[in-house]
Amino acid sequence: MRCKKGDDAMKRRWKWTLTGFLAALALCPRFAGAAPHEDMSTVKTFAFSCSGMSVDQMRSYQIGETKRGRLATIELYLAYTFVLPVTDAELAAFSALLDELDLAAWDGYRQEDSTVLDGESFSLNVAFEDGSGIDAVGTNSFPDGYYEKKGAIQAFFEALMREYEIDADKIGYW
């Protein structure tokens, strides 16, 4: 006999997965009715972290493969860590998002503005299945479109959290 509560949870997960995936596709003009790039490589590992002078600016997002499957690790405010499974469809959507954001243009970015006393820093490391990658780091200096692209990455991981009924807006460091 199957557990009704478990069945309901699985239905909600698939509903949110499909909704998030369709929303991501609908918002990307490149994919609205178009086929994805044939040469677009799939993300193998991903790590993005950003920090600032306040705890609420400290976030870390990772995707990696383990023996038991692909996992996303989300760390917020140096206090909350969530480890969630990532499906093939979610990884494909994330790979498409990185391609759409043109994060490859950041590869090799290494800038620091040491004259700023307070500020923000970031680190990005992506490895793709085809062997290519992106490595970028900045302190008080950022590549073009940094805040918009950071927001898109954050939105992807927050959508993943919502699939598991975790509301990032209700999590605080206080």
Show the residue positions of the predicted features.
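Short, Lys/Arg-enriched N-terminal segments with co-localized hydrophobic residues
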Residues: M1-A9
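Sec-dependent N-terminal signal peptides of Gram-positive bacterial secreted proteins and lipoproteins
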Residues: R13-A32
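Short, well-ordered, aromatic-rich surface patches in folded extracellular/luminal domains
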Residues: G33-M53, L84, L97, D107-W174
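Short, surface-exposed charged micro-motifs
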Residues: M58-Q62, S123
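Short, solvent-exposed coil/turn segments at beta-strand boundaries
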Residues: Q62-G69
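A short-motif feature that recognizes glycine-rich, charge-decorated loops
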Residues: A72-A105
